[in-house]
Amino acid sequence: MEDLIQTDATINPGNSGGPLINTKGEVIGVNSIKIKEAEGIGFAIPINIIKPILESFSVNGNFEEAYLGLFAYDKEVIPYLDNSINFDSGIYIAQISVDGPSKTSGLKVGDIITKIDDISINKMSELRNYIYTKKVGDEVSLTILRNKKERVVKIKLGKKA
């Protein structure tokens, strides 16, 4: 359960969707999931993920999720999958969708994404959170390592189906 805030706020069927509020009275998330087996443990979607969705709904009446069309593993996961792969920072591209924008960009399985628009990336969740702030059709620049050489790849974000 990545990208979620763990909370002890009571979440029951029918009351999910309410705000998660910090001690300053600020909304920091939307309560959404309760684990049945663990009494008193719930999860909320962070407000930084919700905000672009709400803004899109208020302006356009809908939300189109921007899409890169790839899946990557965090550096910490790689040794469990293949201990011959070594890199200092970034995320390892493990899969490229056949119909996504990454397919035509020149990205390859095995590339290491180190930055998006000059912002360092070390977790897939960081990449996802950044993409949440973008719109379908926006162009992003990915800095990648391939064969220990740095390259910049520009990708126009697609619409997630």
Q: Where would I find each of the regions flagged by the language model?
A:
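Short loop/turn motifs at secondary-structure junctions and domain boundaries
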Residues: M1-D3, A9-P13, K134-K135
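Short beta-strand segments
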Residues: D3, I41, R151-V153
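Second-shell loop/turn segments in exported
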Residues: Q6, A38-I41, I116
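C-terminal recognition in membrane/secretory proteostasis and scaffolding
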Residues: N22, P52-A161
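Catalytic nucleophile loop of clan PA
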Residues: T10-V30
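Residue-level recognition of oxygen-bearing side chains
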Residues: Q6, S16, E26, I49, ...
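Short hydrophobic beta/alpha edge segments that flank linear recognition/processing sites
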Residues: V27-K34, I113-I116
